[in-house]
A protein has these predicted regions:
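A structural signal for short loop-to-beta-strand junctions that line the ligand-binding cleft
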Residues: 67-68, 75-78, 106-141, 170, ...
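C-terminal lobe and pocket-closing loops
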Residues: 255-270, 281-373, 403-405
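Short, solvent-exposed loop/beta-turn-alpha elements that line the ligand-binding surface or hinge
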Residues: 97-110, 171-177, 193-214, 262-273, ...
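Conserved C-terminal helix/tail region of periplasmic/extracytoplasmic solute-binding proteins
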Residues: 22-27, 142, 324, 353-406
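Glycine-centered hinge/linker elements that transmit conformational signals in sensory
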Residues: 159, 202-231
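Extracytoplasmic/periplasmic solute-binding protein
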Residues: 123, 132, 156-204, 247
Length: 406
């Protein structure tokens, strides 16, 4: 198995000037998720396009689009903005190219700590860190005599007290949308319980156990305190719930905090919104959360000219001190010159608490996919936790055998 060498550093060492923007040729076509920090990054890259063609697709469906689009020859996109999990299927299918030569030639503004290096090959350049953590309404907690929760058991108790007081019917929210989002909630909670997804460093599944059952039971308790339509709610949907005043405690990505704390919306809710550390669970001492990086990769099935133009534009953005100064509240930037502010607290606390990175294992995408589809019936009350976990392992094993992991 490949050794993954990834470092997320928040006290980053100095480097020299930003990327040169004198691009004369090539085509730049970027696929990225859709949230403010990534739009800022892509707009900064566009400043450097020179004479190159420049297109971008921001989509919440980026994970579904990426592999088919990069499998085409030539690839539909020259750049895929990826993260811990989404880079793995690209590497498994040999769809992205190493960037060592381009880093050496054009990467003077990029810090070594930003380089995602796998078996000596630079496969991505990271520009921001992310995690999911708690958001709380301090006014609602104070009114009900509730301390800021530090564990998910305390989250459940707090939400039950708020509901019992008649303040809110569904006081908790998290991105439980069936599929990728729901699976991510399981991953976080299972890691918080000390779970390991695979046996003995191999690819045999290892979730049908007491920790897996405890994970599902906690997810069910939280789901029962959430909107009845929670299995359709992604990050954007729960932000709407928060801004509508329907929720007092929420688990959400750090990168989504910007629009919750801006000048738009209900001033009372904004003033009472506080970002705090991720919660622990089950008596564990590490967060029930995972650390993530976002970075850019280059498609293999594009010309060298397109790869060079794309790298230079993206390297300009991924090393822009001006960008991180202007957009300091949008992300925890892994770029020289970034000064963490109040909106960075969730990521910084997660690091201090020893949060684990999302598992960058070749077979993890198959496990994630199985979780996203097979635990839904349990949360709907239609089957037991044990049966749901059996279903997950069976679905995973089928896919793992098809792809040669088992």
């Amino acid at each position: 198995m490949k050794k993954i060498l990834v470092t997320l550093l928040f006290l980053l060492f100095g480097t020299v000037a930003n990327a040169d923007c004198n691009i004369k040729s090539g085509s730049i076509n970027i696929l990225a998720n859709d949230f403010p920090a990534l739009r800022t990054l892509v707009e900064t890259a566009k400043e450097c396009k020179g004479s190159a063609d420049f297109k971008v697709t921001h989509s919440a469906e980026h994970n579904k689009i990426a592999v088919p689009a990069l499998t085409a020859n030539p690839s539909e996109f020259s750049v895929r903005v990826a993260a811990n999990s989404s880079i793995v299927p690209l590497m498994n299918a040999d769809l992205i190219r190493p960037m060592n030569d381009l880093v050496k030639k054009y990467g003077k503004g990029i810090q070594e700590s930003q380089l995602i290096t796998i078996d000596g090959k630079v496969m991505a350049v990271a520009f921001m860190a992310n995690t999911q953590h708690l958001y709380v309404r301090t006014d609602v907690l104070k009114e009900n005599g509730i301390a800021i929760p530090k564990t998910y058991e305390e989250v459940v108790a707090a939400a039950e007290k708020i509901r019992a007081a008649g303040k809110m019917k569904y006081p908790y929210a998290a991105a439980y949308k069936a599929g990728w989002n729901l699976a991510e909630e399981f991953v976080n909670m299972y890691i918080g319980h000390g779970g390991e997804f695979f046996k003995d460093g191999g690819a045999q599944p290892n979730i049908n156990n007491a920790k897996g059952v405890a994970t599902l039971n906690m997810l069910k308790k939280l789901a029962d305190l959430s909107n009845p339509d929670s299995l359709t709610h992604d990050s954007e949907a729960i932000k709407v719930e928060w801004e509508s005043g329907n929720v007092a405690i929420m688990t959400l990505w750090a990168s989504r905090s910007g629009t919750l704390l801006d000048d738009e919306g209900d001033a009372k809710i904004t003033a009472a919104t506080k970002l705090v550390a991720p919660a622990t669970v089950g008596g564990g001492n590490i967060p029930a959360a995972t650390l993530w990086w976002d970075g850019f990769t280059l498609a293999k099935n594009r010309s060298d000219a397109d790869a060079e133009a794309s790298f230079r534009a993206m390297a300009h953005a991924a090393s822009s001190k001006e960008m991180v100064a202007k957009a300091a509240d949008q992300a925890v930037w892994l770029v020289e010159g970034f000064v963490p502010g109040p909106k960075s607290v969730g990521v910084i606390e997660a690091v201090k608490m020893g949060a684990k990175p999302y598992p960058m294992l070749p077979q993890m995408g198959l496990m994630h996919g199985a979780l996203g589809s097979e635990i839904v019936e349990f949360l709907q009350g239609n089957e037991s936790a044990e049966q749901a976990l059996k279903d997950v392992e069976a679905a995973y094993i089928t896919k793992a055998k098809e792809q040669g992991f088992l």
